[in-house]
Design a protein with these regions (language model features):
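Low-complexity, Gly/Ser/Thr/Pro- and Asn/Asp-enriched, turn/coil-prone segments
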Residues: 25-90, 180-198
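Short beta-strands within extracellular/lumenal beta-sheet-rich domains
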Residues: 82-108
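Extracellular carbohydrate recognition and processing domains
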Residues: 137-166
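A short beta-strand element within beta-rich, extracytoplasmic domains
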Residues: 100-124
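Catalytic-core regions of hydrolytic enzymes
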Residues: 2-34, 198-284
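Short beta-strand-plus-loop segments that form exposed binding edges in beta-rich domains
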Residues: 172-182
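Residue-level detector of conserved catalytic or cofactor/ligand-binding positions
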Residues: 285-291
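Short, surface-exposed beta-strand/strand-loop-strand elements in extracellular ectodomains
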Residues: 124-140
Length: 292
């Protein structure tokens, strides 16, 4: 908790204002509510697909995200419980208004700021410029996401203000418009940090996810078991410490900065850790006058 009080309000905004794209293995959103919109789990929120004359949404052969339970036990991975969808890309043309898209419209329990995370699967012909639009109270913000890397986990887009309820100015849209010939992939979209849902010792913490350790956030983010549970569930304290570096290594595996390790190919250039366990002690040193 102590280090998060520095990292979230100060360190991450400072780095982002300097132009960095920041990833943190712990939850970064202090919003206690969490709404997930997904094709596999219909609820009060809305997931919608619209095809074009040339392209139709299809289920991939790769497993995707699905939240089929409220609480997850050790080793359970929500990113292997569902499906993901894909569609052929189309280049933008002035006269072509027949673009295909997917929409995620959440039903939010309260007005406030929510982090927006998207997910997808990296496919053999994924494109590097998947176009996402986030509709929020401040307008519309566009993102180009490289789906050639980072598939099968949560990808943070930003934190935005949304109104309570379900409306057409609070949603995420993925278009099949691209400058490349290939496919874009759609899976779940998450709004808000939420509460911890990883069971340890037969119960959950009852805390907001941002107050929990990286071990539990990484499991919710679809990391492989060995990334967050090197001690096989027998020592969460040690696992939590190791999860932070293990997650970064897995995300960057296969990239130009970490070519020797298998992973998601995200080119993470630098890692930084803030420690709060430094201390000091009083030491008395006796220096005697040399004998002549």
């Amino acid at each position: 908790m102590f280090t998060q009080s520095f990292i979230l309000p100060y360190v991450i905004p400072m780095l982002e204002n300097a132009g960095a794209i920041v990833y943190t293995p712990r939850e970064r959103d202090t919003q206690k509510n969490e709404i997930i919109v997904d094709n596999d789990t219909p609820n009060a929120s809305l997931y919608l697909e619209v095809g074009s004359k040339k392209a139709r949404w299809t289920t991939t052969s790769v497993k995707g995200f699905a939240q089929k339970k409220a609480i997850y036990k050790d080793g359970e991975n929500p990113f292997t419980d569902g499906t993901s969808r894909y569609i052929q890309t189309e280049k933008k043309k002035k006269k072509n208004k027949d673009q295909a898209f997917a929409e995620w419209v959440p039903t939010l329990p309260a007005t406030g700021k929510y982090a927006v995370y998207v997910s997808y699967q990296t496919l053999p012909n994924s494109v590097s410029d998947a176009k996402y639009l986030v509709f929020h109270n401040g307008g519309v913000t566009e993102f180009k996401v490289n789906q050639k890397i980072g598939g099968g986990t949560w990808v943070y887009l930003g934190t935005f203000e949304f109104d309570k309820g379900n409306n057409d100015y609070g949603m995420v849209v993925l278009s099949n418009e691209s400058s490349e010939h290939g496919v874009v992939c759609a899976d779940a979209v998450r709004f808000g940090g939420g509460m911890g849902n990883i069971s340890r010792g037969g119960k959950i913490s009852g805390l907001p996810r941002y107050l929990e350790g990286a071990r539990y956030s990484s499991q919710w983010a679809g990391m492989p078991y060995d990334v967050y549970a090197g001690r096989k569930g027998e020592n969460d304290y040690t696992d939590d410490i190791n999860t932070r570096s293990n997650t970064i290594n897995y995300l960057s595996g296969g990239s130009v900065y970490n070519p020797g390790q298998t992973g998601l190919g995200v080119p993470l250039e630098m890692t930084m850790a803030l420690h709060s366990d430094a201390g000091c002690s009083l030491s008395l040193i006796h220096i005697s006058e040399p004998t002549r």
